[in-house]
């Protein structure tokens, strides 16, 4: 069997073309069903190590998106403009990580799409904070509780070569 970057398939193919084609079919279908605005929602990221399956590459190899909300790389990204295959600017956004921001996307009557990241650092709700504190206390009390034991060491990397096995091959966990 041919060794590839990952052992699973996201319809990406080696060059991303399968993914781009599948996404384009989805965009075309949404338009055929009468969608006025097409907003992609993905978990692709923009990290070069994910190439050719990044949100920027999906946008660049398709037409029809008006905006794209992304994740995976946990990038703080507001109002980034990426050009699609037809040269149209598409708004790309991500909120970062650990709920540090909440994203707000505004669709204006003239078709303009803007995004804003609202920091959660300055936002607090007493009732939510109390509920969270209670839940966190319960979880903290459970931490350290032994629920199973095994004599087998589970490996992320191959112990003989040091090569990472997760997502690229079989591990002794499965």
Residue ranges with predicted function:
Residues 1-46, 85-174:
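Acidic/His-rich catalytic or pseudo-catalytic neighborhoods
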Residues 47-51:
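Beta-propeller domains
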Residues 53-106:
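Conserved beta-sheet core of the metallophosphoesterase superfamily
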């Amino acid at each position: 069997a041919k060794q590839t970057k990952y052992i699973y398939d996201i319809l990406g193919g080696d060059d991303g073309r399968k993914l781009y084609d599948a996404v384009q079919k989805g965009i075309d279908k949404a338009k055929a069903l009468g969608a006025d605005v097409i907003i992609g929602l993905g978990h692709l990221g923009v990290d070069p190590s994910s190439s050719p399956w990044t949100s920027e590459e999906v946008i660049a190899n398709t037409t029809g998106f008006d905006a794209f909300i992304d994740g995976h790389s946990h990038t703080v990204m507001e109002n980034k403009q990426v050009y699609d295959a037809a040269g149209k600017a598409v708004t790309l956004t991500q909120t970062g990580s650990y709920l540090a921001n909440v994203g707000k996307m505004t669709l204006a009557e003239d078709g303009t799409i803007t995004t804003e990241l609202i920091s959660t650092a300055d936002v607090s709700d007493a009732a939510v904070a109390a509920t969270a504190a209670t839940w966190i206390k319960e979880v903290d009390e459970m931490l350290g509780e032994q629920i199973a034991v095994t004599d087998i060491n589970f490996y992320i990397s191959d112990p003989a070569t040091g090569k990472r096995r997760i997502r690229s091959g079989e591990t002794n966990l499965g």
